[in-house]
A protein has these predicted regions:
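Auxiliary, metal-adjacent structural segments of Zn-dependent hydrolase domains
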Residues: 31-32, 88-143
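Second-shell loop/turn segments in exported
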Residues: 76-84, 132, 153-165, 214-222, ...
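Bacterial Sec-dependent N-terminal signal peptides
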Residues: 1-11, 17-67, 293-304
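Metalloprotease/metallohydrolase-associated module, dominated by Zn2+-dependent proteases
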Residues: 196-278, 287-304
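Active-site recognition of the HExxH zinc-binding catalytic motif
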Residues: 160, 164-185, 229
């Protein structure tokens, strides 16, 4: 009985060895694939890609990403990709009203040196739990996220809307990047001192009456860092007439505080980067008017 079991096991062992050898032999005879089984996402170049190469990458070394990428997104928010045709319009808008305005006033070398090297776009706003939503963010001085691209069409003919949802936020975030390169005077944060309220800026009573308290916007009350960026962005993106109306609403004390801050912002930009904010505002206002008046073709992808 023992001998029979042993013989059977021995036979099975030999059979297994033969089977394995046959399998390995068969495998060794197969031709290896000439392509790796590990693939990287590949995309077909569009007219837009070639236009971006000519107008963003070549002159400025800026990557304008309009295709959705998980790695560039903030997974704390639900969002969607930017629509192709609206990403095209936004790329024109950013180039004409922002990038080329800095070229005009500060020279192309300034823009090449300091403007963020990546612009990543998403279709939806990033909504927060406190009832606000994120329009734009800057990361590490090299990347700007632009959200809400899919709403661009409805705002293109209105300068105030373009400022509120897109242009002011771009200049605001660019200011943060400049501040990371050259810091502003610590005296700035002493002007409003203990009046900053952090995340309470969007809640009553801080969501009204900011001008009278010496802040150019409600969000400027968040911190001195946001206050500085808001001062620059709100000044260059809005007309002299609008600014004067805000100062009248602010009253004597509010106007005094805001004017003190503005002078420090102007001095910072001129001394640190050679940028005249009055000249920059003039350039932006002219370019903004040309866009909202339909004088700039935001769909043109020609390479001529």
């Amino acid at each position: 009985m023992t001998t029979s079991v042993y013989s059977n096991l021995k036979f099975l062992g030999i059979a297994c060895v033969v089977a394995v050898a046959a399998v390995l032999g068969a495998c060794s005879e197969d031709d290896l694939a000439d392509k790796s089984v590990i693939t990287v996402d590949k995309v077909d170049y569009t007219e837009f890609d070639y236009w971006l190469q000519r107008n963003y990458v070549k002159p400025y070394n800026i990557s304008f990403k309009y295709r959705f990428e998980d790695i560039e997104s903030d997974m704390n928010y639900y969002t969607i990709p930017a629509r192709y045709e609206l990403a095209v319009k936004l790329a024109h808008l950013v180039k004409y009203v922002c990038i080329e305005a800095y070229d005009e006033v500060g020279g192309i070398d300034f823009t090449r040196a300091y403007f963020p090297k990546m612009i990543f776009t998403i279709g939806e706003w990033e909504y927060r739990n406190n009832g606000t939503y994120i329009l734009c963010t800057a990361e590490g001085g090299r990347k700007i996220l632009l959200s809400g691209v899919n709403y661009l069409e409805e705002h293109l003919g209105n300068a105030d809307d373009l400022n509120t949802y897109y242009l002011q936020t771009i200049h605001h975030e660019f200011t943060h990047i400049l501040n990371q390169t050259v810091n502003y005077s610590a005296d700035f944060q002493l002007i409003s001192g203990a009046d900053y309220v952090a995340d309470k800026w969007s809640q009553a009573p801080f969501n009204t009456g900011c001008l009278q308290r010496g802040f150019i916007s409600s969000y400027a009350q968040h911190s001195h860092v946001e206050d500085f960026a808001e001062m620059l962005a709100m000044f260059v993106c809005n007309s002299e007439r609008q600014w004067d109306a805000w100062m009248a609403e602010a009253g004597p004390e509010g106007e005094r505080i805001i004017t003190t801050k503005l002078e420090m912002v102007k001095e910072y930009m001129l001394s640190a980067f050679g940028i005249d904010l009055e000249a920059l505002r003039s350039a932006l206002q002219r370019r903004q008017f040309e866009v909202t008046s339909g004088l700039v073709d935001l769909d043109d992808l020609s390479l001529d």
